[in-house]
Every structure is written in structure tokens, then in C-alpha cells.
């Protein structure tokens, strides 16, 4: 590696500095010339008369020309479609003119603005022991009476039936405990009389 002499180094720095300063001055001159051209733009842009073949437009002519030549567009045919079908795709063979019954739109998803709760309640069977739901005494009574009608005449079956159906009601309404027992005794007595 050669050692650069001080004279060569000074020449190199002077050349680069002069090059950089000339670029700065040229940029300033361009900016100034742009400013001068903007100031002088009004001088050049002033109308000096109309060249041959051109004519000027008056405000009245422009006003008369405008609204008469505007083409008014009618509303699109999509707006004539019912609102319930507006977001539905045109697939699965559905046409724009096709009419549907109210029952067909009831099963559409929430995206089309329908509520899903009604269809979910219809599809999900009543599962009393799931999800923290309890059964009512009436449903248990009805179910047990339907299943065990033949074997209800023995005292053990009556006690089992009473304990299964009334335990839930006794917890909820302890003051009605005695009246429920009396009701079952009357039912048992009536069944015994029917057997005889």
C-alpha cells in the first residue's frame, strides 16, 4: 500500500468538495429557476387571442349543454328482488326471478339475517340430565306411568314411584309435601278399587 502524499490528498479533497458544491449550487439554481418560471407563468399563460378554428364557450352555453346530455340510469333489477334473497349466491340453481316460500328461507344461516335458535331447538332432543337441566315431576310421572302400568299394584312399586317422582318437588316446595302424599294415597286407593 502506497502512502498518499499530502499534495495529492489536498488535490483529492479539493476536487471532491468542488464537485459537491457545484451539485448544491446547481440544485439551488434549478429551484430558483422553477420559482422564476412559476412567477413568469402568468405572463406566458395570459390569453393573446383565439387562434383560428377555436371558439370560446360562454357560461350560458356550458349550462345549456350540461344537463340535457346526461343519460339517467334506471335502478338496477337487483333491487326488485326481496331483501331476504339479496345476500344469497346464485349457485345451486337459484335464479334472480325465482320466488321462494317463507318455509324455505327459515332454514338459512345467520349470514342471511335469520335466527338459528329456532332451528337448534327443533333439532336437539330434550335431554334433561345433560347440561344441568332437571326434569319436572310431571314428565317423570308420565314416563313412569306409561312404562310401568302393569306393575303399579304392588306396594313396593308405589313407594318407588313416589320416591322417584316427588323427591324433586319436595326439595323445591317442602310445604306441599303432605298434600302430595295424600294425593298419591288417593290415587293408590282408586287403583285398588278398580282392581276389585
From Swiss-Prot:
The modification Phenylalanine amide is found at residues 92, 131. GO terms for biological process: negative regulation of gonadotropin secretion; neuropeptide signaling pathway. Residues 27-55, 95-99, 115-121, 134-196 form a propeptide. Keywords: Amidation, Cleavage on pair of basic residues, Neuropeptide, Secreted, Signal. This is Pro-FMRFamide-related neuropeptide VF. It comes from Homo sapiens. It is found in: Secreted. The keyword Signal applies. Belongs to the FARP (FMRFamide related peptide) family. Residues 1-26 form the signal peptide.
